[in-house]
A protein has these predicted regions:
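Residue-level recognition of single "structural anchor" positions
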Residues: 1-247
Length: 247
């Protein structure tokens, strides 16, 4: 019954898994492993931590529908100065690229990816994976985006005009996402997120953000259950080993 799903070979009763999933999705800002351990009465922090990481990995479906229309794209550092970083490099900081659909004056769906650097070799594959060809990609003038001129996208470039104009004014939607993401990581997880596991947390943030207009927390729970039964199983060792490879 559970073979080929997130629940394969689990020693935890499915009823407890469902309680964990409900708690994770019913809380507006999610839940930390420490809080989940306390709520479910688990004796092991590792059990709660592994459960949450398995569920975070299930939140993102391979082959999901890509963003479309006009999409802003930019990068920012977690834990560092997010404005005007010369050369796009800060030693020891985590770099995240964000794509955000324009929805009138608001934000549509988003995608996020933890990347090692802001080169075209990292940025263009993210755009191709995340944004439908034929869409308009709106970026700043960073050279890593220049190959978009020959790709299957319309490329709109906005450059800062002097020091009085902020990057957040040129690309307001992605910078709003930067701010919300940072606040969420600090609020729910007190900023205690290891860089090698950051992508899993970004998956959860995107899952929540893209369903923020849902009137029912039950819908998030239902979607997570759907994803969990359609996701290949992952063991604790696989989670740890994949994190080591990301370092």
């Amino acid at each position: 019954m559970t073979a080929g799903t997130v629940f394969q070979d689990t020693r935890t009763p499915l009823t407890v898994w469902f309680r964990a999933m409900w708690w994770l999705t019913s809380q507006k800002n999610g839940v930390s492993a420490v809080a989940l351990q306390r709520v479910l009465g688990w004796g092991s922090y590792q059990t709660a931590w592994t459960c949450l990481h398995k569920l975070r990995r299930a939140m993102i479906r391979p082959g999901r529908e890509r963003l479309a229309g006009v999409v802003e794209v930019d990068e920012s550092y977690l834990g560092g100065n997010e404005q005007g970083v010369l050369g796009r490099h800060i030693a020891g900081k985590a770099l995240v690229v964000v794509a955000a659909e324009e929805d009138g004056r608001g934000i549509g769906r988003i995608r996020l990816r933890h990347i090692p650097d802001a080169s075209a070799a990292r940025l263009i594959p993210f755009i191709e994976d995340s944004i439908e060809p034929g869409s308009t990609v709106h970026t700043d003038g960073w050279y890593g985006y220049l190959p978009l001129r020959t790709a299957a996208y319309q490329h709109r470039i906005s450059n800062q005009k002097g020091h009085s104009e902020r990057a957040s004014e040129l690309l307001p939607r992605v910078h709003q996402v930067f701010s919300l993401r940072k606040r969420w990581l600090l609020g729910t997880h007190q900023g205690a997120v290891a860089g090698e596991h950051l992508q899993d947390y970004l998956n959860e943030f995107a899952f929540r953000f893209n369903r923020r207009k849902s009137r029912s927390r039950g819908k998030l729970f239902y979607r997570l259950v759907q994803h969990a039964v359609a996701t290949e199983p992952t063991t604790y060792r696989q989670i740890v080993d994949s994190a080591i490879k990301r370092k």
